Amino acid sequence: IAEFSDPPFRGDVAPNVFPAYYLILKCWGRRFDYFTIPGEKALGCYTPYKSRERIKIIPQGFDLNAVKRRPYEPNPQPTFAYAGRFYERIRDPRFFFDFLETLDADFRFDLYINCLDPCFAEMIRQAQQRVRGRIVLREALPRERLIERLGAADFLINFDNTTSNATPSKLIDYAMTGRPILSFNDRTFDPDGFRAA
């Protein structure tokens, strides 16, 4: 049995993937009787490598008792947070950082990034210099501590994937904080709605 969390590369996400990669995946897939995936949305990403009846959907598990939830206390300045990774053409936040430069208000945006690509590190560095509020790059934390920290924000940011083949597992963690979640990507972002939040 092979377990997946994120789908393998597809042409809509990574059009320049080495062509033999798909053949390698298909050969590799033959070594397993079944694939398990966390959600039905991603099914089409796996059927080129394994027949539908050999793909089982098993949602990701979590232990709610392992999470300590603090009582919410409003922050002195609007504070919002994001946890996860950024990916070019999939989960690219440049539009949001450009928007933050237009805000004429104090705020704090906490970023918990577990792996930061150089292009996004530079984007964050430049934005930190240009915004009126603060953008704070925090260290990656173990899941339970991260959920507790996220619960101290006024609200959470989820950058929706531009592809529809996966749902970020961070939404489970976000929901466990009890904080409001604003989800959007560059096509669905509403600047006026954000200002009202």
What is each residue range found by the language model?
Residues 73-90, 97-101:
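Conserved donor-binding/catalytic core segment of Leloir-type glycosyltransferases
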Residues 27-30, 142-153, 176:
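Short acidic alpha-helix that forms the nucleotide-activated donor recognition element
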Residues 41, 60-61:
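Carbohydrate-associated surface elements
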Residues 2-16:
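A short, histidine- and acid-enriched strand-loop-helix "catalytic/donor-clamping" loop
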Residues 13, 61-78:
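Acidic anion/phosphate-binding donor-loop and adjacent secondary structure
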Residues 77, 113-115, 121-145:
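Nucleotide-activated donor-binding/catalytic signature segment of Leloir-type glycosyltransferases, i.e.
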Residues 8, 17-35:
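Membrane-proximal helix-turn-helix segments that form the acceptor-binding/catalytic region
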Residues 33, 150-165:
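Acidic donor-binding loop of glycosyltransferase active sites
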